[in-house]
């Protein structure tokens, strides 16, 4: 049998509102606001050009359960384009766009298979190769129970079996648990490929057979850093090939500038401009956190008479009008540890923290560790955690002192 080819994507979050962005020029905000649509258009254009056998969209097509009209219209138009090119689409809805939401419905063309709330199978015949695709859509926002047992165990290995699942591993404590599973449970189904969604970070949980999170197609805030995209998958009974395709219209990223031995403001500005220019060349349009590292005794003088906010505004003005956009969302100062002792306030706080034992730290953090909703996601406090907390506290205190 010949190999099949499909695109695996998830978490489109079309029409995401992009909250928390302040002070952007209007043209920059519009670029960011429409970035999910631009990323999605990249996928559709690629599909029309490359003509894969089908597309898999694993949950959270829309950002909200109300499925905004602009998002639905653009998605429906994209499906019509794929229909004209005879490209099937198998999709599921996730926790953000579950079936129990309220929205004005658009009819999708016949090439689109919408998975229902109960685990179902879509069967395709591609050049003589039978393909079974299993999955479900969320009936409501919070699907906390495991759905794995509803997926049939594959027995006919002449058929290519693909599982679609919008959910998270039982062991993943960094995200709210939805439709939880273990890797072992997925492997027990004997499928040739697991197309996952829900986690916005690209991950390969297992090599053979592949258990794959493609991540989302466009970052929505500064915690979702790096390039985003989807997987172009070539699959046969004997082999699989995964090719990651970039779709990010705007990349969220961290840029670092070494400030050691700097004396003059123009020197720092030039270094920042050079670093942002390199980022622009590498990633195109971007939103960055600019980290000023190694601020020693010489460089600290640059912040004695100018606040961090003043520096941020000056750097933004220098970048304004340069295309593609590179918006500095946040400026972070990393003061050399040798400078902490130069302020009595910093020194007194550090001395106080050094006197606390692990019991004292637990008492200080008790509100966090006793929180009804969040406590189960937090690992037990360790000595390494305490050291990290102290270092972060010192940097934050030094930064706040320099802001005043």
Language-model features and meaning:
Residues 120-127, 214-274, 289:
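Binuclear metal-dependent phosphoesterase catalytic core
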Residues 1-69, 380-387, 391:
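N-terminal active-site segment of His-dependent metallophosphoesterases
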Residues 54, 65-234:
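His/Asp/Glu-rich metal-coordinating catalytic cores
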Residues 49-51, 155-157, 282-283:
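Glycine-rich phosphate-binding loop signature in dinucleotide/nucleotide-binding domains
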Residues 47, 82, 279:
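Hydrophobic pocket-lining residues that define ligand/cofactor binding sites across diverse proteins
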Residues 39-43, 74, 271:
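Well-ordered alpha-helical segments embedded in enzymatic catalytic cores
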Residues 247-404:
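Accessory, non-catalytic peripheral segments of nucleic-acid enzymes
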């Amino acid at each position: 049998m010949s190999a099949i080819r499909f695109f695996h994507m998830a978490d489109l979050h079309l029409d995401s509102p992009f909250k928390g962005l302040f002070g952007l020029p209007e043209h920059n905000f519009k670029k960011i606001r429409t970035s999910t649509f631009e990323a999605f258009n990249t996928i559709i254009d690629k599909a029309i050009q490359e003509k894969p056998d089908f597309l898999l969209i694993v949950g959270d097509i829309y950002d909200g359960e109300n499925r905004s009209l602009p998002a639905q219209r653009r998605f429906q138009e994209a499906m019509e384009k794929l229909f004209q090119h005879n490209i099937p689409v198998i999709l599921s809805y996730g926790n953000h766009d579950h079936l129990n939401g309220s929205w004005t419905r658009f009819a999708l063309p016949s090439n689109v298979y919408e998975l229902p709330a109960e685990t179902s199978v879509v069967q395709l015949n591609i050049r003589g190769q039978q393909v079974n695709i299993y999955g479900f859509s969320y009936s409501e926002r919070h699907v906390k129970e495991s759905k794995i047992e509803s997926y049939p165990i594959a027995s006919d290995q002449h058929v290519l079996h693909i599982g679609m699942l919008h959910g998270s591993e039982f062991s993943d404590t960094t995200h709210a648990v939805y439709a939880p599973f273990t890797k072992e449970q997925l492997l027990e189904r004997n499928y040739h490929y697991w197309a996952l969604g829900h986690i916005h970070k690209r991950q390969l949980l297992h090599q053979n057979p592949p258990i794959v999170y493609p991540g989302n197609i466009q970052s929505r805030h500064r915690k979702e850093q790096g390039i985003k995209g989807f997987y172009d998958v070539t699959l046969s009974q004997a082999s699989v090939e995964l090719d990651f395709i970039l779709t990010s219209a705007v990349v969220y990223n961290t840029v670092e500038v070494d400030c050691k031995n700097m004396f003059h403001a123009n020197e720092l500005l030039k270094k920042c401009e050079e670093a942002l220019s390199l980022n622009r060349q590498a990633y195109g349009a971007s939103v960055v956190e600019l980290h000023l590292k190694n601020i020693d005794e010489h460089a600290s003088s640059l912040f004695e008479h100018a606040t961090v906010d003043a520096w941020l505004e000056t750097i933004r003005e220098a970048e304004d009008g340069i295309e593609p956009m590179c918006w500095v969302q946040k400026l972070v100062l990393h003061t050399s540890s040798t400078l902490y002792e130069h302020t009595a306030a910093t020194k007194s706080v550090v001395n106080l923290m050094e006197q606390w034992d692990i019991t004292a730290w637990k008492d200080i953090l008790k509100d966090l560790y006793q929180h009804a909703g969040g406590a189960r996601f937090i690992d037990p406090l360790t000595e390494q955690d305490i050291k990290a907390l102290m270092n972060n506290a010192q940097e934050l205190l030094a930064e706040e002192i320099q802001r005043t």
